[in-house]
A protein has these predicted regions:
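Flexible glycine-/small-residue-rich
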Residues: 6-8, 37, 57, 74
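Short acidic/polar hinge/loop motifs at secondary-structure boundaries
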Residues: 9-37
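Outer-membrane beta-barrel translocator/receptor signature
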Residues: 13, 29-31, 42-114, 135-139
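Extracytoplasmic loops and strand-loop junctions of Gram-negative outer membrane beta-barrel proteins
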Residues: 16, 35-36, 69-71, 123-129, ...
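A generic local structural motif
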Residues: 17-22, 84-86, 141-142
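Structural motif
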Residues: 22-25, 44, 144
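Periplasmic-side early beta-strands and strand-to-turn transitions of outer-membrane beta-barrels
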Residues: 91-170
């Protein structure tokens, strides 16, 4: 079994994944992805003998943020008339480290090119110009506040993810 973690906390066991069971992790602001294989995964979670995938982000800063950083991204896809944007800010306000992020994804059904589906001679089927139920929508907002010092750090964060996935072939 493989478990997915976000900053060391269990998000989901891969055994329970499927097209209609997405992983509740916002991929905006990821710093690194850690892979832990085999028995050493027991340090992070029990029952994960297949390994651990730990997604590390910067929602709770472990060191003081020395400058204000704004990031803005946009992506467009032609196969499904999709768009994806994200905006985030990290900085220091009144001695507290602050991280705010929002991302949105809106993907329509996948287009099927003309003549892409080949039928046996004599067969007749309805022709679709798209793959039904292949659409997806996501909105994710993250907020993190932390305080650091010679003694270490503490922080709190919140993530709100609203996701809707179509399940093709169902």
């Amino acid at each position: 079994r493989v478990k997915v973690l976000n900053n060391g906390l269990v998000v989901r066991d891969v055994a329970f994944m499927g097209a209609d069971h997405p992983i509740e992790v916002d991929i905006g602001g990821i710093q690194q992805i850690e892979i832990v294989k085999g028995p050493s995964s027991i340090l992070y979670s029990n029952g994960a003998i297949g390994g651990i995938v730990n997604i590390v982000d910067n929602t709770i800063a472990k060191e003081d943020v020395l400058e204000n950083i704004f990031n803005l991204g946009f992506e467009s896809q032609s196969v499904n008339d999709g768009d994806n944007y994200n905006i985030d800010y990290s900085g220091s306000v009144e001695g507290l480290n602050l991280f705010i992020s929002h991302s949105s994804k809106n993907l329509d059904n996948f287009d099927i090119p003309d003549e892409a589906v080949i039928h046996e001679p004599g067969e007749t089927h309805d022709e679709f110009s798209y793959l039904p139920n292949s659409d997806s929508k996501l909105a994710a907002t993250r907020l993190g506040i932390s305080k650091t010092g010679d003694w270490g750090y503490y922080g709190i964060s919140s993530v709100i993810i609203d996701q809707l996935n179509g399940v093709p072939f169902h």
